[in-house]
């Protein structure tokens, strides 16, 4: 068989395998979504969703929360995958590189300076601005200082620690109950999400869909600067567009649910290890897997304690930290 036919056959098999992965992930998200609507202090299975109790528990309380969880999980996972490609760092992730903390500190300072009287829309925009500033700062370090992967990771962690310290000082010196409640919320949680936050949830959707369709551009960027330019890709323009998209997704996610770590790190790596490496399929796969995993984590956060709720950030950190350590031992290119 000629080499060209062999290559075409292998490419066809790989695409078929990638599409099968996406189908399985879609089925997994559907199961997790149904389970999320059913789980809680009062369990209501699909056969009971037409009853009076379901009108409150399923359609008014759990449905908006489940939709928010899905979109935030998808956004964080896709943002993590794009950051890993953009920074050429296998351990890049919104939480680890301080982007989520940048959004958080902007939100906390807005509440502190505004005495809790500013509208929710303004606070959400401040979170987006904080995420954008942190992402552009990291990108500037990566490009101008020629930092190695390890140094960039350390810079991101250090910036995240500084942001966490600023938030802690702000809470310590504040007598505002809103700010103290906000600090608990910054641990990650969807407890206050209902239909009133639908505009924040919808704000994620167009940017998320656009980013999931940029696999071709990311594949070109992975070839290197010279090859990407030869293929007609404007690297400066695309980097700025991708940074804006990442900042938007992370900022809105933080405004909606607080800081949730490790989703953007673990999900892309798990999918790559399963053989999903083409960015055109990896990004939609990350969206589906991130939605399903965060739905499962949200159910765990809701049902673990009786009449109480764990911060979802605690659940993802408990599961993600061991996986992060394992990934550190596997990534040989981190120098």
Curated annotation (Swiss-Prot):
Keywords: Cell inner membrane, Cell membrane, Membrane, Transmembrane, Transmembrane helix, Transport
UniProt keyword Transmembrane helix present: yes
UniProt-annotated location(s): Cell inner membrane
Topology versus the membrane: Multi-pass membrane protein
GO cellular component: plasma membrane
Presence of the UniProt keyword Transmembrane helix in the record: yes
GO biological process entries: cobalamin transport
Spans traversing the lipid bilayer: 22-42, 67-87, 94-114, 117-137, 153-173, 200-220, 243-263, 281-301, 308-328
An MF annotation (GO) of this entry: vitamin transmembrane transporter activity
Classification via Pfam families: FecCD (PF01032)
Subunit structure: The complex is composed of two ATP-binding proteins (BtuD), two transmembrane proteins (BtuC) and a solute-binding protein (BtuF).
Family: Belongs to the binding-protein-dependent transport system permease family. FecCD subfamily.
Job of this protein: Part of the ABC transporter complex BtuCDF involved in vitamin B12 import. Involved in the translocation of the substrate across the membrane.
HAMAP family registered for this protein in UniProt: BtuC
Protein name (record): Vitamin B12 import system permease protein BtuC
Name of the gene encoding the protein in the UniProt record: btuC
